[in-house]
Design a protein with these regions (language model features):
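Conserved N-terminal catalytic core of the sugar/cofactor nucleotidyltransferase
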Residues: 2-5, 13, 27, 31-115
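Short alpha-helical oligomerization interface
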Residues: 19-23
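A short, conserved beta-strand element in the Rossmann-like catalytic core
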Residues: 118-119
Length: 119
C-alpha cells in the first residue's frame, strides 16, 4: 500500500508565515506538521512507501526535510514528487497532483491519500 500526501498548495492565506515555508513544514509542538501526519499513519503496517507531492517553490524544502526527517514514527521511505507548478495560475490541484503521482511513479497498488496540513 502506498501513501500519497498532498502538499502542493501555496498557503497564501497564511502569508507572511508561509511566504518562504510550506504549511506542512510549519512546526507544531516542536516538529513539522507533516511529521504528525506520518506518525498518525505509522501503525498501518501495510504502507510500504510514501510520496509527498509538492510544487516547484517548495520542492527543495521537502527534499531537505525528507533527508533529515525522524523516521521513528513512520519507517517507510518518503519520496518527494515535484509537480513543477510555480503559482496558483498553473497549479494542478489535488486531483491533478494525485494523477501525477500515480502515473509518474507507476503506482498500481492500494493508496491512502491525505492532506499534508491536516492533524
Amino acid at each position: 500500500m502506498k501513501l500519497i500526501i498532498l502538499a502542493a498548495g501555496y498557503a497564501t492565506r497564511l502569508y507572511p508565515l508561509t511566504l518562504n515555508q510550506p504549511k506542512p513544514l510549519l512546526p507544531v509542538a516542536g516538529k513539522p506538521m507533516v511529521d504528525h501526519v506520518l506518525a498518525s499513519l505509522g501503525a498501518i503496517d501495510a504502507i510500504d512507501e510514501a510520496f509527498i507531492v509538492t510544487n516547484e517553490k517548495f520542492a527543495g524544502h521537502f527534499e531537505a526535510w525528507a533527508g533529515r526527517r525522524d523516521s521513528s514514527g513512520f519507517a517507510p521511505p518518503v519520496r518527494v514528487v515535484n509537480d513543477h507548478s510555480t503559482g496558483d495560475d498553473n497549479k494542478l490541484g489535488a486531483i491533478g497532483d494525485l494523477h501525477l503521482v500515480l502515473k509518474t511513479q507507476g503506482i498500481d497498488d492500494d493508496v491512502i491519500v491525505v492532506a499534508g496540513d491536516n492533524l
